[in-house]
Regions:
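Phosphate/NTP-binding elements of NTP-utilizing enzymes
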Residues: 2-215
Length: 215
């Protein structure tokens, strides 16, 4: 298994155009933090802020996945857009790209909730299964990718499981930072009122009612 090179992380620029210096809010508490621990937390916060603005670098450093130029462009442009539509050729890797983006956002943003919707529950579960295989390093064509860092952040609520739930209500997982991902089925009446980011896989085949409820 290829391990993440810590030298790459240490060589990150100290300041980035999207960072605001060292203006990090420190919540006052009953037990004051030592200056050494506070300095360590600030380094982590600056690292998080840098990667939030550079998702392609994050995917390369933490998942060891080198995207194609077109894929990297899609990730960078779609990263902070409220609505994104991808129209790509067959074999572009749309579903895999979606999964990589979900994994990156789950790790970089706290309480990031994502729902995967498709025309049928099985199709959404297939997209989820690809994400699960990425986390378990079970995709032969992506030689050298490392999903162990992402998998280590998944909450394991059942001692006999690995954190990935395959319930009849939808496949799901949650991270320690509060991020959550779940698949949706075609029963739209049970999904009204849910809040979060929705990913439509093969959205061209969804009916109007499903699009209006999920969106």
């Amino acid at each position: 298994m290829m391990m993440m090179n810590p030298d790459l992380i240490q060589e990150l620029p100290k300041l980035n155009y999207c960072e605001q210096g060292n203006k990090i809010f420190v919540k006052p508490g009953v037990y004051p933090l030592s200056s050494r621990k506070l300095e360590g937390f600030m380094k982590i916060a600056n690292l998080q802020k840098y990667y939030q603005c550079n998702p392609v670098r994050f995917i390369n450093d933490f998942f060891n996945i080198e995207l194609l130029d077109a894929q990297a462009w899609v990730i960078q442009r779609a990263w902070n857009c409220p609505n994104v539509l991808l129209v790509c050729t067959r074999g572009f890797g749309k579903s895999t790209l979606i999964d990589i983006m979900i994994m990156a956002k789950d790790m970089l943003f706290n309480n990031y909730w994502t729902y995967i919707a498709s025309g049928s529950g099985s199709q959404a579960e297939q997209t989820f299964t690809t994400l699960e295989r990425l986390a378990n390093d079970n995709i032969d064509t992506m030689l050298g990718s490392t999903g162990y860092i992402f998998k280590a952040e998944i909450e394991i609520k059942n001692a006999a499981g690995d954190g990935f739930s395959h319930s009849s209500n939808g496949f799901s997982y949650s991270l320690y930072n509060g991020s959550f991902t779940q698949t949706l089925n075609s029963n739209v009446d049970k999904k009204r009122g849910m809040r979060g980011s929705v990913v439509f896989d093969e959205c061209g085949f969804l009916d109007e009612e499903m699009m209006s409820v999920y969106a």
